[in-house]
């Protein structure tokens, strides 16, 4: 395995930084970490200083699979829910990539620039609406557990500075106080 000999670290948010709470070396493509948790929390698996994937620390046996094509976490209810969402988002990301390729093909095929612009813009807007709906619905369905705030923070961290997009405003406006008062969301 290309990961053999690498150290993996589990880190959780602590104030404004990520705190390492466990680590393991990958041997023959496998690693194992065990522990007892008194609460459910979002975490990230790191290789060196690079976050490679989010997951939920919760009671149960968590299985993490990393290969060249994808990363999947299963075995517990919230991780199953999170990676179902990740799979749907990846599918939309793939469609967005394919849309860019389609635009290039249309140019190469000699289609009229205004026709290309119209068609590609329509498809981009449709895809953006699907992505926003997916994120909003997922966060709303998970207001009451760590996934709602966790994915909300990931959505916000896509921007180089704090910004209130219409999507972020909608999520906040419709959220219960418990979500709004979460320390991660308040920041």
Regions found by a protein language model. Give the residues of each.
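A non-transmembrane, solvent-exposed segment enriched in polar/low-complexity residues
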Residues: 1-133
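Charged, long alpha-helical assembly modules
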Residues: 140-143, 147-187
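A short, acidic, amphipathic alpha-helical segment used as a generic capping/interface helix at domain edges
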Residues: 133-139
């Amino acid at each position: 395995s290309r990961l053999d000999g690498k150290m993996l670290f589990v880190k959780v948010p602590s104030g404004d930084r990520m705190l390492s709470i466990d680590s393991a070396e990958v041997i023959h493509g496998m690693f194992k970490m065990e522990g007892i948790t008194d609460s459910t929390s979002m975490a990230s698996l790191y290789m060196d200083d690079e976050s490679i994937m989010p997951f939920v620390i919760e009671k149960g046996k968590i299985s993490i699979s990393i290969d060249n094509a994808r990363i999947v976490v299963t075995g517990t209810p919230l991780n199953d829910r999170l990676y179902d969402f990740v799979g749907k988002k990846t599918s939309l990301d793939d469609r967005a990539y394919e849309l860019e390729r389609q635009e290039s093909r249309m140019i190469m095929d000699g289609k009229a620039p205004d026709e290309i612009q119209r068609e590609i813009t329509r498809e981009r807007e449709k895809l953006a609406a699907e992505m926003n709906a997916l994120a909003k619905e997922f966060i709303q369905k998970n207001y009451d557990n760590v996934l709602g705030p966790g994915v909300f923070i990931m959505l916000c961290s896509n921007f180089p500075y704090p910004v209130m997009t219409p999507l972020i405003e909608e999520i906040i406006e419709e959220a219960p106080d418990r979500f709004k008062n979460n320390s991660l969301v308040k920041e």
